[in-house]
Amino acid sequence: MERKRRTIKNGILFVLIGLMLMIAQACSTKPSTSNESASKQEGPKQGGTLTVVRLSDATKLDPHFITDIPSANIVYQKVYEGLVEPDKDFKIQPLLAKEWKVIDGTTWEFKLREGIKFHDGAPFNADAVKKTFDRLLDPKTASPQREKFSMIKEVKVVDENTVQLILEYPYAPLLSILASNEGSIISPKALAENPDSLSQHPVGTGPFVFESWKTGQEISLKKNENYWGKKPNIDRVVFKVVPEDATRLAMIETGEAQINDQVPVTEIDRIEASDKMALYRTEGLAVEYVGFNVKKKPFDDVRVRKAISHAIEREAIIKGVYNNVGTLANEAMSPKVFGYSDKIKPYDYDLNEAKKLLKEAGYEKGLKVTLLTSDRKERINMAEVIQSQLKGIGVDVKIQVMEYGAYIGMIEKGEHDMAIGGWGNATGDGDYNQYNLFHSASQGPPGNHFYYSNPDVDKMIEAARRESDEKKRLKLYEEVMQKEIDDAVYVPIRNYEHIAAYSKNVSGFWLNAASYLMIDDVVIK
């Protein structure tokens, strides 16, 4: 993918090369046809509206309050940008910051690009960066993302185009968290005038400008004609909510839409057999699991959690529900994330041990529980398989299916018994999994939907945050993840593989490892 940010130096170089080529062509006696000349001048086709069909609508569009991928996918690298960004290999590259250096272990200095404006005309500068992070870190803001940046002690404006982040302690994955959606820089004008409106009307510096949101129907973004970098080829992108799986694919085939960014595995054969559609597959950084609300009975008893962990046949879910798309997970961290360990041992499938544990917990005659899931087809199928499996130990499972936004609301309030869930990693670093999923400070909206609290686990997670030695960090993550499994907080199910369908008339898009749709270079034929 062509880098969309170019320095002035590179621009001058390209101009000189272009002049030399023109001179060489003028001196040549070889004739060229008009078609050849036209093809050299045309470049990527411009214009058109990209329609992306999705199962679920966004819940909010303020990056300081977004806690789900469907919402982040609307604004990340489209409306909003951060100081840095990950490339296709998840290596950090400059974005709004053109360069940076570590002055000492706890002071990071960023030199900012000049001449950039937010969509509302406000200038991008060091003060804008400070205002964004001051708002995020202010306890009064009550952002669920605050703890992810809690290592930042102060944001210091050095001059108009230089800003320093002063940390409480050395934090190795700082650039990775700055490259996430949570690190988006927000217009200071919008923050000052009406910060509450950012939930429905985002204002950033990105290649697309927010246009409209018809709740439950569609969100529209238009091309930023004043974008500071390489402008998008398309005029507009519309994210359209279409709950029915078959209808979304039919819209791709008929040309009503170009991308379906979440496709059930049962539709793979249909897509591959189509002459209008193509299949996009990529390994992601997400893990799917069954999680227990450990503050609610009967899951406040570890014996009950262990019993159910022993009674879920995970391999059968991978094969029967997912058709072997994705791989069996052994922990709440993808193998592609720094911190993963293949030494973590989940509970074996053992019905006799499960029954024994239930008897010890006082449930020899069985019990009734509710299993919550979102309305994704595979999640519902998984719930039905688990319901059937748990009958074998006398557990009567009621399945509760909710639209995605309502599902998120319920688990963030802790109103569920057990839930099928997933966690995507936006940084590629284990801290994003461990701190958000298991630290006591992250209970609720930040990500700890297990409502798990263990002082020893908290200490190990915090130690891994502060440790700069990679081998020591890996050892800490290995120890803490086995402890979480031993406490039976969740049952790991699947390492995620993202599947999308797209029209053969569209090119240039890709999905990054965090499952974000990247459309900077999209061309509609």
Locate predicted features.
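Ligand-site clamp/hinge motif
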Residues: 224-270
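Aromatic- and charge-enriched surface segment that lines or borders ligand/interaction sites
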Residues: 98-142, 158, 164, 298
